[in-house]
Amino acid sequence: MAPTLQGQWIKVGQKGGTGPGPRSSHGIAAVGDKLYSFGGELTPNKHIDKDLYVFDFNTQTWSIAQPKGDAPTVSCLGVRMVAVGTKIYIFGGRDENRNFENFRSYDTVTSEWTFLTKLDEVGGPEARTFHSMASDENHVYVFGGVSKGGTMNTPTRFRTIEAYNIADGKWAQLPDPGDNFEKRGGAGFAVVQGKIWVVYGFATSIVPGGKDDYESNAVQFYDPASKKWTEVETTGAKPSARSVFAHAVVGKYIIIFAGEVWPDLNGHYGPGTLSNEGYALDTETLVWEKLGEEGAPAIPRGWTAYTAATVDGKNGLLMHGGKLPTNERTDDLYFYAVNSA
């Protein structure tokens, strides 16, 4: 039986210019016919640069945006970014010396950076890496990730959502999901028809003394209208537990691809066991479907940069780079174009 969600994989050509090259643990966001890329690593836990790369879908060429305004001061890995309208927002990330970036926006019309929030201030969100970001028309959301830590405390994971109100420039933490909710990094995180979904991720046990650092297959959503969290049971072609996978929303579907399905004994320094499978979750029926494999990336990968995008009039999942089973990084640019949803 053919899946309900029909689409096709397209390897996007990159015809030159100065681009990000092979990397992982970076962030991308799409605005109009441009793709923006920031941060990342080529070797484990070593930053590369703090340039903002711009890909033009019309010419299929890369360039570097000139750093006008309050540009990022830290070369980041484990950073995330999202787009709202014509602005992109970056949050967190760190360099190899554990200097952490803050929260900034970049106006794609004026090509100017704006400093918005210093992280780790009292009453505001904490600095972090390997978190997840999502957005709607009025908010930027940050979920999970790994804390900064320090000389007196060990880095830990988060389980809460931080919400930034774009209109008034203020942060608020949404209701805590409670002790039965795993703290996670590298989770799927998406706004679908007004609800905020958390899908899978790399988890810390909810049982005192239990096993930490494992792949989760939990799926929950937060409803801003009722201010309540709900954990759901999904069915169908359910993917195995995983983290650091590419994902995007198209209609009522959360599309995911690849990711780490088993952690490496050397932690982030190794590749882990990676996937090259794609799935779509219908958030109304809670049924998973497996995506078609024709044209999909043949080599498994994780820690890709990802975003929802519209390319040639079709909505879908766009992803760049990632870590391969050889522990090398790739600079592939792939788009899963949805034909029907």
From Swiss-Prot:
The entry's keywords: Cytoplasm, Iron, Kelch repeat, Lyase, Nucleus, Repeat
- Tissues and organs where the protein is expressed, per its UniProt entry: Expressed in epidermal cells of all above-ground organs except the anthers, in cambial cells of leaf and stem vascular bundles, and in glucosinolates rich S-cells found in stems just below the inflorescence. Absent from roots.
Provide the residue positions that the database annotates as binding a (Z)-N-(sulfonatooxy)alkanimidothioate: 46, 94, 129-130, 157, 186, 211, 244, 303
**Effect of altering residue 244 to C?**
Strongly reduced activity upon benzylglucosinolate but slightly reduced activity when allylglucosinolate is used as substrate in the presence of myrosinase
- Give the result of residue 130 to A, as annotated: Lost activity
> What happens upon changing residue 18 to S?
In strain: cv. Ei-2 and cv. Tac-0
Explain what the record says happens when changing residue 260 to A/Q: Lost activity
Q: Name one Pfam family in it.
A: Kelch_KLHDC2_KLHL20_DRC7
The Kelch repeat boundaries are 34-82, 87-133, 139-194, 203-249
- One of the protein's GO biological processes: defense response to bacterium
- EC number(s) per entry: 4.8.1.5, 4.8.1.6
Name the consequence of residue 13 to E.
Answer: In strain: cv. Ei-2 and cv. Tac-0
| Result after altering residue 94 to A | Strongly increased ability to hydolyze benzylglucosinolate but slightly enhanced activity when allylglucosinolate is used as substrate in the presence of myrosinase
Q: Where in the cell is it found?
A: Cytoplasm; Nucleus
Cofactors (names):
Fe(2+)
What is an example of a GO molecular function annotated in this UniProt entry? lyase activity
- Describe what happens without this gene: Accelerated leaf senescence and increased pathogen damages.
Claim: ATP-binding is one of the keywords in the record: no
Please name the SUPFAM superfamilies in this protein's record: Kelch motif (SSF117281)
Q: Where is this region: Disordered?
A: 1-24
Swiss-Prot/TrEMBL catalytic activity:
a (Z)-N-(sulfonatooxy)alkenimidothioate = an epithionitrile + sulfate; a (Z)-N-(sulfonatooxy)alkanimidothioate = a nitrile + sulfur + sulfate; (Z)-(indol-3-yl)-N-(sulfonatooxy)methanimidothioate = (indol-3-yl)acetonitrile + sulfur + sulfate
The terms describing its cellular component in GO are: cytoplasm; nucleus
What do we know about how this protein assembles, alone or with others? Homodimer. Interacts with WRKY53.
| Biological role stated in the UniProt entry | Specifier protein that contributes to constitutive and herbivore-induced simple nitrile formation. Converts glucosinolates both to epithionitriles and to simple nitriles in the presence of myrosinase. Promotes the formation of epithionitriles after hydrolysis of alkenylglucosinolates containing a terminal double bond. Mediates indol-3-ylacetonitrile (IACN) production from indol-3-ylmethylglucosinolate (glucobrassicin). Triggers the production of 3,4-epithiobutylnitrile from 2-propenylisothiocyanate, product of 2-propenylglucosinolate (sinigrin) catalysis by myrosinase.
Q: What does the record's miscellaneous section state?
A: The proton donor differs depending on substrates.
* Record's protein name: N-(sulfonatooxy)alkenimidothioic acid sulfate-lyase (epithionitrile-forming)
Species annotation:
Arabidopsis thaliana
What is the organism lineage in this UniProt record? Eukaryota, Viridiplantae, Streptophyta, Embryophyta, Tracheophyta
Gene name of this polypeptide: ESP
